[in-house]
A protein has these predicted regions:
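PLP-dependent class I/II
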Residues: 1-155
Length: 155
């Protein structure tokens, strides 16, 4: 991810029949990536292999810090193996859906999450899940853990 989460820059390598279809869709989505993103991409591709090992270690450390805090607060966590976020089950908190829970979390606890329903073809399938990102500074994760403790009163 090169620590530029959300930039949505990438490439595809595929047979021409597939890349032709990809290009047709891509033309409707964007004309081209902004020049600074292209420059950053070129630099990122030249990084040594150690960068990736260190990045994976940092994410693993952050993941292993956040998940126990989430579990202590009452979430059931789905262990990620290649992402910088964790999906969680919120059914223990008694909210009717993920959107309601996410709004409560921001307003009452001061933490943002992404409603799980936004990741499903059938939103109802994710209505008792939310996603938390752990690609944050350790101090931010510490503060999140502290704030999450307030949720225990909802159990």
């Amino acid at each position: 991810s090169y620590s530029v989460t959300g930039w949505r820059v990438g490439w595809a390598v595929a047979p021409s029949a597939i890349t032709n279809a990809i290009r047709k869709v891509h033309d409707f989505l964007t004309v081209g990536a902004p020049a600074p993103l292209q420059e950053a991409g070129a630099v990122a591709l030249s990084l040594p292999a150690s960068y990736y090992r260190e990045l994976a270690d940092r994410y693993r450390t952050r993941r292993d810090h956040l998940i126990p805090a989430l579990e202590k607060a009452g979430f059931r966590c789905y262990l990620p193996r290649g992402a910088y976020y964790v999906m969680t089950d919120i059914s223990a908190f008694g909210f009717s859906n993920d959107v309601e829970f996410a709004a409560y979390l921001v307003k009452e606890i001061g933490i943002a999450c992404v409603p799980g329903s936004s990741f499903y073809k059938h939103p109802k399938d994710g209505s008792q899940q939310v996603r938390f990102a752990f690609c944050k500074k350790p101090e931010t994760l510490d503060e999140a853990a502290r704030r999450l403790e307030k949720l225990r009163s909802r159990l």
